[in-house]
């Protein structure tokens, strides 16, 4: 298990790109298509085609369909299409337990039809699922068309489900493929998840892995929403979230934030607007810091102003009374003459003290007599 799973106290890695039914999340299309296939199988309608962009969950859907059907269904699953129609028939014959005497298409198809008749007579059905069908050649598509023609009355002897990327429809829409297109009983398309669906999908996978959605912070969720503002596919979502968790782990964080998501988009080469969101967050943080600095400066200036105001408070009545008793005349800027007889110091000491006091208080222009400071 990856170290980030332990770091975030997860029991499982939540965003591995493997078709694990444990993490399956039905965002709407899957349930509809599974219901469509089930109904088609019951009614024997025949050929169903499902397309969708890369990573939209087609393979996961096929795995879920395999798990849906009981043992009475003869299920044949192909991870990718064969190179040609002959290989297709030989593969089906082998899966049905047949040993054709010849590899000629006519004889192989005869044996396949016989086996399918036996299956249907037993009250069973056969379903063939072919993944990555967009890789099919026109020869293989025509081989599928011939298989779809195998019928017993109004009942199709074999049910066919083709899963492929949108390129499959480009092939089907060609003029020469009209006979094939006319035989499609149901055509479905897996679309991208909406932004709301993306967030629910991520939450679901985190919870299945034993985690809490709080592992992604508010800015992290917002960045993910921006990254998938036009929708997302399971594969891309898994890749981005897996890398975001890994980035946060490398930075020893307890939760994924917008910067981690942005770093993940950079590592994946995704072009999103997350960068602009980061710039906005940085600007808000800078403004908040500037506002705090202004507040701190205002507090300091207020304290300094209050201190200066306290230093300029008028003398108390007792000091004024004492001053007036010594010098009844109004005090101006001049330093009053003090009789030396009252000072118990030498002439030199007196002069030094008086001059120092005079110089000090003339500079500050304080209206207070030196005698009060010497007393």
State what each model feature region is.
Residues 66-68, 168-183:
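Short regulatory helix/loop adjacent to the ATP-binding pocket of P-loop NTPases
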Residues 114, 121-162, 174-176:
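Conserved Walker B catalytic segment
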Residues 106-113, 125, 201, 213-228:
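Short conserved motifs of the RecA-like P-loop NTPase core
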Residues 209, 213-375:
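C-terminal alpha-helical "lid" subdomain
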Residues 44-64:
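Walker A/P-loop nucleotide-binding motif
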Residues 78-82, 172, 185-198:
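Conserved AAA+ ATPase "SRH/arginine-finger" region at the nucleotide-binding site
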Residues 10-13, 17, 74, 84-102:
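Conserved NTP-binding/hydrolysis module of P-loop NTPases
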Residues 1-44, 299:
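A short, basic N-terminal segment
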């Amino acid at each position: 298990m990856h170290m980030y799973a332990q770091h975030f106290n997860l029991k499982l890695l939540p965003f591995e790109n493997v078709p694990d039914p444990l993490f399956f999340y039905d965002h709407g299309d899957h349930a509809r298509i599974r219901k469509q296939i089930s109904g088609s199988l019951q009614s024997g309608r025949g050929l169903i085609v499902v397309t969708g962009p890369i990573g939209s969950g087609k393979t996961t859907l096929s795995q879920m369909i395999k798990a849906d059907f009981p043992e009475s269904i003869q299920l044949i699953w192909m991870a990718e299409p064969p190179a040609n129609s002959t290989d297709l028939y030989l593969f089906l014959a082998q899966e049905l337990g047949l040993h054709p005497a010849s590899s000629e298409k006519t004889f192989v198809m005869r044996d396949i039809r016989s086996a399918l008749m036996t299956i249907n007579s037993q009250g069973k059905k056969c379903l063939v699922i072919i993944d990555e069908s967009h890789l099919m050649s026109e020869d293989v598509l025509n081989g599928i068309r011939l298989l779809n023609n195998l019928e017993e009355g109004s009942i199709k002897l074999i049910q066919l489900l083709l899963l492929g990327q949108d390129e499959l429809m480009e092939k089907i829409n060609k003029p020469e493929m009209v006979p094939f297109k006319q035989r499609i009983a149901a055509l479905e398309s897996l679309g991208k998840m909406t932004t709301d669906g993306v967030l629910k999908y991520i939450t679901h996978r985190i919870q299945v892995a034993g985690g809490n959605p709080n592992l992604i912070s508010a800015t992290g969720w917002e960045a993910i929403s921006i990254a998938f503002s036009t929708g997302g596919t399971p594969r891309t979502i898994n890749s981005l979230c897996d890398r975001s968790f890994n980035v946060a782990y490398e930075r020893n964080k307890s939760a994924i934030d917008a910067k981690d998501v942005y770093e993940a988009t950079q590592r994946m080469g995704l072009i999103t607007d997350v960068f602009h969101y980061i710039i906005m967050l940085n600007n808000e943080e800078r403004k908040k810091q500037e506002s705090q600095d202004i507040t701190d400066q205002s507090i300091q200036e207020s304290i300094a102003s209050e201190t200066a105001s306290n230093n300029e408070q008028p003398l108390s009545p007792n000091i004024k009374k004492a001053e007036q008793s010594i010098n009844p005349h109004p005090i101006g800027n001049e330093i009053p003459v003090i009789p030396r007889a009252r000072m118990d110091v030498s002439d030199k000491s007196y002069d030094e003290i008086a001059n120092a006091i005079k110089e000090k208080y003339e500079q500050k222009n304080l209206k207070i007599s030196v005698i009060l400071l010497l007393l």
